[in-house]
Design a protein with these regions (language model features):
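N-terminal capping segment at the start of a domain
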Residues: 1-23, 36, 43-45, 55-57, ...
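Extracytoplasmic/secreted proteins, especially bacterial periplasmic and envelope-associated proteins
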Residues: 3, 7, 24-35, 150-154, ...
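Noncatalytic luminal/extracellular "stalk/propeptide" segments of secretory-pathway proteins
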Residues: 3-106
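Solvent-exposed loop/turn segments at secondary-structure junctions
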Residues: 46-48, 123-127, 151-152, 175, ...
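Soluble metallo-hydrolase cores and metallopeptidase-like ectodomains found primarily
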Residues: 61, 75-90, 132-213, 225-228, ...
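Active-site-adjacent substrate-binding region
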Residues: 137, 282-377
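Acidic/histidine-rich catalytic neighborhood of metal-dependent amide-processing enzymes
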Residues: 180-183, 206-302, 320
């Protein structure tokens, strides 16, 4: 199999949902699935997106003057031309995603004390491009910008010392209605229980401005390697559906649409397990989020029997951060494979040269073992 991660991240490049490059990636994945002998189905869907019209920028005006690293928030409101200037005040924590993305929040204040805009610091480090989760989008169309953790630390030091912190910030974007994306499915029919299904999935879009090598071309490559392993080995008893989801970076629109339509058709109860591969191209260990406990025990038995052992960290707290979550909400056993840590997450530096091909191979082998175990023979 060719270097799929290289093709998606380098030859095609950034693949924001609804773009022509995302559509090119969908066609490439569909063709690869056909070459593997899978029966391919494509599910188009429309969604509400957002595109930047001015980049996120923050300039420190007091107690010193300098530029501050800034990232865009998808679905942010727009600042007026010329930006917004005001005093910075710490206003608490923004709970973008419970137990995971809980970030320090600052307001840019007008002279009368009203909030003009918000600066939210990435507790994990750099000023990345990120999305305002449902909670963040409920409170009007205020301008939001992502800061880095170092700026948060600086603000805390200055405010604790009683110093005034002033900034000028700018960001602008437009909501785009009717953007088109696709879920691409490759089907490997079951030999004796074809009405029961195992879903193996990975999203193929990337965040704005990022080549998305690790997030998530690596997951797509791992998924297709599993498909290759399954197609060339003993046929599974249950049907295995390999799904490349679109628009994951826009709040998992692709997987949410797929789950909703399967539920409408009365087909959701066919799905017995879901294995999701997201960012498996780097890291010193494999982080596996899995629920319920019975599914975790099956994973552990598979990993214990593998000839090539590698560090695995288990977590049972399933969060709305990737495409396994809509299935989990419907009570379906799920597992997400993630390589961690990865310092180039959601940045323009998430490129092919950062990828460890051996990590992809090992993740694919581990997941293949799990899929074979739950799909039966």
């Amino acid at each position: 199999m060719e270097d799929i991660t290289r093709h998606l991240s380098q030859n095609i490049g950034p693949r924001p949902a609804g773009s022509s490059s995302e559509h090119s990636a969908a066609q490439y994945i569909a063709q690869t699935m056909i070459e593997l002998g899978l029966t391919v189905e494509t599910q188009p869907f429309y969604f509400l997106g957002w595109e930047p019209t001015r980049p996120a920028r923050v300039e420190l005006l007091a107690p010193e003057t300098r530029k501050i690293p800034a990232g865009s928030f998808l679905f942010s409101g727009s600042a007026p031309e010329g930006g917004i200037e005001g005093q910075v005040a710490h206003v608490g924590t923004m709970y973008l995603c419970r137990d995971f993305f809980e970030w320090p929040k600052y307001a840019v204040k007008a002279a009368d004390g009203s909030d003009l805009a918000y600066l939210v610091a990435n507790a994990g480090g750099p000023a990345i491009t990120f999305v305002l989760y449902e909670l963040g989008r409920l409170f009007g169309r205020m301008p939001y910008v992502v800061l880095d953790l170092a700026t948060h630390d600086y603000f805390q030091q200055q405010l604790a010392a009683g110093n005034e912190v002033r900034v000028r910030m700018d960001t602008a974007g437009v909501v785009k209605d009717g953007l088109l994306s696709h879920n691409v499915t490759g089907v490997l029919p079951g030999s004796c229980l074809p009405e029961e299904e195992i879903v193996v999935c990975a999203h193929y879009d990337s965040t704005l401005g990022s080549p998305g090598a690790c997030d998530n071309a690596s997951g797509v490559e791992a998924m297709l390697r599993i498909a290759e392993n399954m197609a060339h080995g003993p046929k599974p008893a249950k049907t295995v559906r390999f799904i490349a989801f679109g628009a994951e970076e826009y709040l998992m629109f692709g997987s949410k649409f797929y789950v909703a339509t399967q539920k409408e058709k009365g087909l959701l109860d066919r799905i017995k397990n879901v294995v999701n591969l997201d960012m498996v191209g780097f890291g010193d260990h494999l982080a596996v989020t899995v629920a319920p406990e019975s599914f975790k025990r099956r994973l552990q038995s598979v990993f214990a029997g593998m000839a090539e052992a590698f560090p695995v960290e288990y977590n049972s707290n399933v969060l709305p951060v990737s495409d396994h979550y809509p299935f989990y909400e419907e009570g379906i056993p799920v597992a997400m494979f993630l390589g961690w840590p990865y310092d180039d997450y959601h940045q323009g530096t998430d490129s092919r040269d950062k990828i460890d091909p051996d990590m992809i191979r090992r993740a694919a082998e581990a997941a293949t073992g799990v899929v074979r175990q739950v799909a039966g023979r």
